[in-house]
């Protein structure tokens, strides 16, 4: 090719412009926590609130660290047999105040599938037209599905698998010994076994926080931020499976 030709100049200029555009598109990072609010959570109510506030702190730190490439939002869905309460709903992290015990009051049963299906389906719909998004979903429960009316396990599995194609990161935090089996039925491979004590709850939120930090760092790397939107999604699919694995190596 003639490097002095107008054609070469146009191709080079187009490539440079596209690279610049990709590098300047901020990733909108949605952090969704689906938190059990059934009656059995009352014994660790304070620890759950404190742990979630630590999660907010982790996200605030990530926003400052990656201010040029990421914009963080938080959603907290607290669920029990009374329904799903969106305590935060795609709230910019700069506007998210700490959770208080007055806002998180455990009671009644565990409609786990309804909580997952309702919140994920709505978030998926809300961000469908955003140019570049990354999503982290953490599901925390000390019990088992026992009260859902709208969603079944197979439908939840299909929904999660569909979201994972877009690079969503999912984690299932459970107190039962058969957590791996429960998580696998809905296609979640990232799991944290939760010792439901004061110290165990602190450790659980810390583990989830570190995994999210790794995810934020990976999607902020130049290899990702300078890639096309399609390639970013491909990278996130890989990152979503690596971030929890790294904590057990």
Segments from the language model and where they lie:
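Acidic, low-complexity intrinsically disordered regions
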Residues: 5-249
